[in-house]
Amino acid sequence: MCTVPTKRFGRRCALKLGALAALASLEACSSGSSASPTGTVGAAPTNGAAASPTTVSAGVATTVAPSAAATSGTGSAIASGRPATTAAASSVTTGTRPATVANVAGGNRPNIILINTDDLDTKSLPVMPKLKALMTDQGMTFPNYFVNVSLCCPSRSALLRGQYAHNNEVLTNGNPNGGYAHVHALGIENSTIATWLQAAGYRTALMGKYLNGYPASVADTFVPPGWTEWYSPVAGNAYSEYNYKLNENGKVVPYGKKPEDYLTDVIASKATDFIKRSASDPAPFFLYLPTYAPHGPATPGPKYENAFPDAKAPRSPAYNEQDVGDKPQWVQNMPPLAAKQQTTIDELYRKRIQSLQSVDDLIENVINTLKGVGKLDNTYIIFTSDNGFHLGEHRETSGKQAPYEEDIRLPLIVRGPGVAAGKSVEPFVGNVDFAPTFAQWAGATVPDFVDGRSFAPLLSGGAADAWRQTFLIAHYTAESRRGNRPAATGVPPRRQATPGGSAAASTPANGVPETDEEAEAAVGRGIPEFHGLRAKDYVYIEYATKERELYDLAKDPYELQNIAKTANPALLTQLSARLGDLQKASGATFRTVEAQPMPPLAS
């Protein structure tokens, strides 16, 4: 049972009573009464699923000449294997002709702010009252938002490039097939949403976590291409929120353990300063705010150390699943959760929701600052996470990377001009969709390697023409290999990462490893490589071990009954073929395949 806090908070805790009331709603989430297992609630720089048709509308190629600000001392702003000024516009399915710089340069192009939390699950949203009041109630929620690979570096790379992991080749958090050293060696930083928007005349800024292992094989002062302003940890213990160093536009600045050094608050302060400085600048901006919270160790901010003293992790029907005989071997190898493990899970849950209070404050500060400088009405604000997180479901202690709903389904809320307030839309949206969506808002050209599609039409109630009917999910291991991709993917031939880069690449912020729970889940418990299809009413998974999972989510939302062994063999053949087609596809071809109708479970 989920215990709601009843004791008076410590003097330093300044939470609203609304947060307490919201936490009570977790009872419903953990009681099994909900239809959804996840309980979704609603200084200047120095480096200068509804049914839909199956056809895909083609985009229109445009030419964007890089602005003077499109390059910096760190490298070319756009380099995707073709001249930047002739990159073809992706056939991103929007139902309308993609906007171009020529179309909108004379108009009032919107500002874009992306708040990307780390390891946030949907179960924790009820403890964020400011998020609800300022985002959920004022914007649009996407209950079917999924991530391709439920892991930090692959997810963030997909976000920046608009590509699935099998196409951008960022598969894990560390070498040989992931982490910053690998990303930098591939050269994919040279063509991202940052370079595209900067070339289109946007001021771009990142404040917070970039990619796991950054800066790894480059200097601590290195600023990746496309960023006008840059504030990201390069050393120390950023995950602890204290005792870290930031690369601030090419200058390394140390932060200590004083209350004012708390990283989430520092990010918020720099964000509001950037917005205030933007008030008199006619150029639109893209502000990327990737927080470290609530990633472990989930250190709470100074004001919230005593919040939610009695809270326990939600106990859904999937929590500490008793009968796992139908699950793949890696799940069967895990014994039921011991009492000590459950206590540890509850302790981590409390710290996570404590740390989220500072993220809630950040949201409020950003929105209030936008309102104060007159920019709110022309700014899209997006709130999401890099991946989901499990806390006891299916016998797993804590972490991500599994194919289950807790890990692959994430929060996504969008507020901005023309967005219907307090609404929810059902079509599938994924982390590969941010880049083409932002590009459409900005009137920027996107390269043809982009796999995602703009969800901008959904925000204004437009039809999801030729929209995806399934979403590709995957998990990779250190042994996973992908050869050189075809030129159409925009990824140059694989190059060996810098010698010695493996340890650095697997150690975020040059000294902070991923949590022990994640290492245990990915290695000790041996989650094999898998690929899967998340359809409207079911999910299908194939493992490298030849095992399969199939869940009827309409009848079994908590994924307790694997029906793969009793399913119609013809259906399994169809699903396997569709999965294979997607694993080989990229760009417009990928969008065509994923928009094809999915076979029903019952034939």
Roles of regions detected by a PLM:
Residues M1-A28:
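N-terminal secretory signal peptides
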Residues C29-T38:
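Bacterial lipoprotein signal-peptidase II cleavage site
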Residues S30, G95-R97, G106-P110, T117, ...:
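Long, internal low-complexity/basic segments
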Residues P37-T100:
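Extracellular mucin-like PTS domains
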Residues N103-G107, T117-K123, S150, V234-Y262, ...:
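Active-site-proximal cap/lid insertion segments
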Residues I112, D118, L197, K209, ...:
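A short aromatic-rich beta-strand->coil structural motif
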Residues L114-I115, D121-A205, A216, A235-A238, ...:
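Active-site segment of extracytoplasmic enzymes that catalyze sulfate/phosphate-ester chemistry
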Residues A219, P225-N237, N387-E393, V432-A435, ...:
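C-terminal cap/loop subdomain of S1 sulfatases and analogous C-terminal strand-loop tails that border
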